[in-house]
C-alpha cells in the first residue's frame, strides 16, 4: 500500500561545533506511518525533529513540504506566557473559529493526562508542564506529529492511554523515546540514525534487534573481506616494494589509504556494536620505502 509523501529532506548536513552531526542524509515522511526515530545520544534525533518542524535550518541540503500540511511538535523545552491558563496554552495554536469544535478534545485529553486546565501554567510542576505540552500537540491534530520523549512524567495508565490514542491517529507520527515498550506498541516504521546515516525499516520497533543485527552482520562480513584484500596487498608490498620502488610507490600509497580507511571504519563499527572483535591490521609503517 502506497502512502502519500508529506515531507522530504535531501542531502542534508547539519554542523555542530565545526563537526557534522550528519551529512548526505535523506528522509521521507509519508501519510499514516508511525515512525520510531532512534539513535545513540548525540546522534541528532532532536535536531532532525527541529528541522522538520522548521525551527532549525539545514547547513546544506533541501527540504520540501506538501503545501497545506500542518506540523505539531512536543520538544524538550516547553515555552509559555506568564500567568497563562493551561486551557489557553493548549489552545494557543488553534484559531478562535475552531476552538469550539476542539473544546471537547481538550477535556478528554487533559483528563487522560491528569491536567487541571483552570490552573495557571506557572503553578504547574515540571512534569505537569510536559503533559500540558503533550496535550497541546495532540489537540492540534497536525498532519505530522513530532513527539520528543512523550512518556516522560507519565504514569502507566497515561502511557497506556497515549498508546491507544496514537495507534488510532490518522496523521503521521515521528517519535523519540527511551521507553522501548512504548515504541514497540506504537510504531510501524523505524528511522535509525547510525553514524550520521539514516537507515529505514518498514517494520515497527519490535523488529529492531532482528533488523539491526542483520545489517551489522552484513557490515562485519564486508569489513572482513576488505581486511583480507588489504592483507594481500600488504603481503605484496612487503615482498616486492624494495625491488620496484619507483614503479610501485603509487600502489603502496593506495595500500596505506586502504589501511587508514579500514581502521576508521572498524573503529566506527566497534563503537556502534561492541559485539565483534576484529583483529588489528598489520602496521604498514613497518614497510620501508
Which residues does each PLM region occupy?
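ABC ATP-binding cassette signature C-motif
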Residues: 1-223, 278-287
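Flexible nucleotide-interacting loop at or near the entrance of a catalytic core
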Residues: 1-3, 13, 97-99, 217-287
Amino acid at each position: 500500500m502506497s502512502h502519500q509523501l508529506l515531507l522530504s529532506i535531501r542531502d542534508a548536513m547539519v554542523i555542530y561545533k565545526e563537526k557534522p552531526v550528519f551529512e548526505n542524509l535523506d528522509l521521507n515522511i509519508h501519510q499514516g506511518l508511525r515512525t520510531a526515530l532512534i539513535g545513540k545520544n548525540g546522534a541528532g534525533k532532536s535536531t532532525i525533529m527541529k528541522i522538520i518542524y522548521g525551527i532549525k535550518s539545514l547547513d546544506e541540503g533541501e527540504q520540501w513540504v506538501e503545501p497545506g500540511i500542518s506540523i505539531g511538535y512536543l520538544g524538550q523545552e516547553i515555552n509559555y506566557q506568564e500567568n497563562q491558563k493551561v486551557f489557553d496554552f493548549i489552545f494557543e495554536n488553534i484559531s478562535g473559529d475552531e476552538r469550539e469544535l476542539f473544546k471537547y478534545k481538550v477535556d478528554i485529553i487533559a483528563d487522560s493526562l491528569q491536567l487541571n486546565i483552570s490552573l495557571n501554567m506557572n503553578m504547574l510542576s515540571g512534569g505537569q508542564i510536559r503533559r500540558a505540552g503533550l496535550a497541546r500537540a495532540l489537540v492540534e491534530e497536525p498532519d505530522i506529529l513530532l513527539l520528543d520523549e512523550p512518556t516522560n512524567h507519565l504514569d502507566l495508565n497515561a502511557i497506556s492511554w497515549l498508546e491507544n490514542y496514537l495507534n488510532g491517529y490518522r496523521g503521521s507520527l515521528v517519535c523519540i523515546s527511551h521507553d522501548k515498550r512504548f515504541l514497540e506498541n506504537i510504531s510501524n516504521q523505524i528511522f535509525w540514525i547510525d553514524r550520521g546515516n539514516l537507515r529505514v525499516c518498514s517494520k515497527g520497533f519490535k523488529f529492531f534487534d532482528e533488523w539491526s543485527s542483520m545489517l551489522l552482520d552484513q557490515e562485519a562480513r564486508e569489513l572482513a573481506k576488505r581486511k583480507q584484500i588489504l592483507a594481500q596487498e600488504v603481503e605484496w608490498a612487503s615482498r616486492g616494494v624494495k625491488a620496484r620502488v619507483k614503479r610501485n610507490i603509487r600502489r603502496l600509497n593506495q595500500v596505506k589509504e586502504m589501511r587508514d580507511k579500514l581502521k576508521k571504519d572498524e573503529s566506527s563499527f566497534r563503537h556502534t556494536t561492541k559485539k565483534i572483535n576484529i583483529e588489528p591490521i598489520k602496521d604498514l609503517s613497518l614497510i620501508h620505502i
